[in-house]
């Protein structure tokens, strides 16, 4: 009767177990398939099946049924794989089953049982998501408890390194494990165990190896590669330790990678081995390898006795063939310098920091990297005036310069570095042939004057002629004409080398003679050598310098030749020419007439007729006040009246009544003004003279003055003054 009322999920689970007490049982295949279909149909079925498996496992453990426990673990592994979307429903029950199984001393000595538990754990780790790991505290505790029990069993009871590496590999497959502080330490633990076993099976990674050779390799690009990659080497080595290391370090999870690198540093401090470090670095994705260098930098501590080891390991990594991209060179340089200055009392630490800075510049991560590093060191030199700090920074500066094998700096940067570098000739060999500015060349000659060694002066001047050629020639000519026109070794050295550069034997002989007599070249002496363009291709530029009052000639003037025949005339501002009295008088009259337009009243035709008949116009009639800008008003009015009478007689134009006449507008008056400036052609002055005597206008404000000349208008204006 008991079997009649057994729940269906229990029946399906029980049917998967074979009969008998043999330890090597396997679940029945057909019944297992139906059970998987059953648990996939509804979510509630999973809860019932997982709870029943926990209950049955407890009974099997109590009765030492190893075969049934093996069947239970295999069923659990199949359910995890089949129902991974609902893993959070039953995962804690399955972890409980595995913890109880491995905690039972009657079962944890059986390798098969432990392997079956590891298979279930591996399946769980592969399908876990970050939400479950970070939100469920109970699951986190059970996960950690199982790892502790499992590692204890395989190391203390079974002594099985393969199972240990499998467990470490399973931990590395758990996604987003680093985000949970409760279980993130398991990553560090797994890396340490894996590295220890890996070094045991690989002899070349055993023992200390910290030799740093900073002079064997030349400066090269950061993406060089000369040996097997990590993936290729892993295939050659084989085994679970290599697979586990690949899983821990060949990841794009930066949190997980940082934890793994810190575990690596802890192991390397125990047994420093640069080959192991380079192998692990090649395992990391190339775009994330800069994290390895950053973690090493963060691990530095001036109170830590392992600082020298860390710096040496970092140095070996930077000079190795490991490709690193995305490294912030200046940030790393600043951190190392700050640590170095803070540990200035320790010679070993400061020397190790100098080697690391030198190694940092042995690979080119971007174009202007050496210039930026040197500029940063120069800035630190200005910020730290103490002698001890200066000595340390100068040592760093010289170490960086030794890593550069080709010209890269400007002349201006050379002048800033020269006071801190003893071998200035070697330093000048790193200067490019890019033309500097005239001010920089002037500073260069001032620097040469300050040098105490004549041989050094001569050699640097030779190199300057070799790099800048005619620019050095003309810049030196400017300098010695303006500031250095005194007898000195550099003065005669310049003229001697200028003569050799121009291939003038006479110039060279004069330079030797004046050196002996302690005389200087005058401008006239030098003009002789720059006066013939046929012999001296730089004659025109040199002559401009010699005859110029201002010797400050621009770089463009020294490097470019103006077109032939072009005359360089200086722009001299001319003083303004004062106007003549006649121009001034015309200007005043014109201005007054224009201003008086607004005050004038327009004349009427009746006013003009009255004036023509000799009738005096009363002051109250608002008589005309015409313009005086060019000629007299009398002449103007006479011309208008005569024009009106002639046109009326010839064409018979109707003369409107006085009350219908519209006064002249100001625009009409302005047109009449424009007519006054035209030369008289059609009319003679005699016609005006007869009417002038009859005109007697009283002006209201302006002082009347008759015109000194007569005016005539062209026929082009006839009859058009009143047409509007």
Swiss-Prot record:
Gene Ontology cellular component annotations, sorted alphabetically: plasma membrane
GO biological process, one term: protein localization to plasma membrane
Domain of life: Eukaryota
One Pfam family of this chain: EFR3
Family: Belongs to the EFR3 family.
PANTHER family found in the cross-reference section: PROTEIN EFR3
Protein known as: Protein EFR3
Phylogenetic lineage: Eukaryota, Fungi, Dikarya, Ascomycota, Saccharomycotina
